[in-house]
Regions:
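Short helix-initiation/N-cap motifs at beta->coil->alpha
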Residues: 51, 66-77, 121, 138-141, ...
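Ligand-binding cleft/hinge of the Venus flytrap
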Residues: 41, 54-63, 126, 130, ...
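Extended ligand-binding regions for polar small-molecule ligands
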Residues: 51-60, 120, 127, 138-140, ...
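Alpha-to-beta junction loops
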Residues: 63-64, 80-89, 132-133, 168-177, ...
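Periplasmic-binding protein-like
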Residues: 33, 109-116, 183-224, 241
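Extracytoplasmic small-molecule ligand-binding "clamshell" domains
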Residues: 24-91
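A ligand-binding cleft/hinge motif common to bilobed small-molecule-binding domains
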Residues: 91-99, 145-148, 173-200
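Flexible hinge/capping segments at coil-to-helix
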Residues: 117-133
Length: 241
């Protein structure tokens, strides 16, 4: 009986080891689901362009993608502390960020725009923000841009939607946000418009830990493949057309 038990136990262990050998590696992906259409919550689950994109990259690289939603200003610290393996969150590569993390090739080009109430306060350009109270997303490019304008009172929010609600409630004069999320909020909120001006173009990229050269190569190769096989354009058409 003992011998039979040992045989069964050994077979179970061998089966477990065999299955684990074929199991996909997990890749933990940090994001901030407050940035539609790139990442947002739907029925409590993060979805959006960035989420679909990283899922497709995972298929090419043979990784099981696990999405970890958190505050935007916590993403890079989480990456450095190895709580996640990479970050995709409509994040722009900036000189300040590249001091601590590395970025893949760009996957999307955007720009900063100004959202105002229709027909109010004469804001037509970034120069017109002087002396105004302006909402931005904490740590986003808009925060960096507006903070450099003299005479602006910057109101920082953890979610873009909170800034939009503050604008509608007359608590602030404008919101500076990336172009595609801004268009998304305009469609959902009557009485708001985008000023006919845009800031300098910026490029979104995936952040990884410095010196993680193997993952960098895998991601860059997968991005190149997805841009050439038609899948990237499918995602563009799905979320932006």
């Amino acid at each position: 009986m003992k011998k039979m038990f040992k045989i069964i136990l050994m077979c179970s262990l061998l089966l477990t080891l065999s299955l684990s050998a074929f199991a996909k590696k997990k890749l933990y992906v940090g994001t901030n689901a407050e940035f539609p259409p790139f990442e947002y919550l739907e029925n409590g689950k993060p979805v959006g362009f960035d989420i679909d994109l990283v899922e497709e990259l995972g298929k090419i690289m043979d990784y099981d993608i696990k999405i970890v939603d958190m505050a935007f200003d916590g993403l890079l610290p989480a990456l450095q502390m190895k709580k996640v393996d990479l970050v995709i969150a409509g994040m722009t590569e900036t000189p300040e960020r590249t001091k601590t993390v590395s970025f893949t090739q760009p996957y999307y080009t955007a720009s900063q725009v100004i959202i105002t109430r229709k027909g109010e306060n004469g804001i037509k350009s970034f120069d017109d923000l002087k002396g105004k109270k302006v909402g931005v997303m904490l740590g986003f490019t808009g925060d960096i841009v507006v903070s450099k304008i003299d005479g602006v009172k910057v109101e920082r929010y953890n979610a873009a939607y909170a800034g939009i609600m503050a604008l509608k409630a007359n608590k602030i004069d404008a919101v500076v946000l990336d172009s595609e999320p801004a268009k998304n909020f305009i469609l959902q909120n009557e009485g708001l418009e985008i000023a006919q001006t845009e800031g300098a173009q910026e490029e979104y990229a995936i952040a990884i830990r410095k010196n993680d050269t193997q993952l960098m190569e895998q991601l860059d190769n997968a991005l190149t493949e997805i841009k050439s096989n038609g899948k990237y354009q499918e995602l563009i058409n799905k979320y932006f057309k």
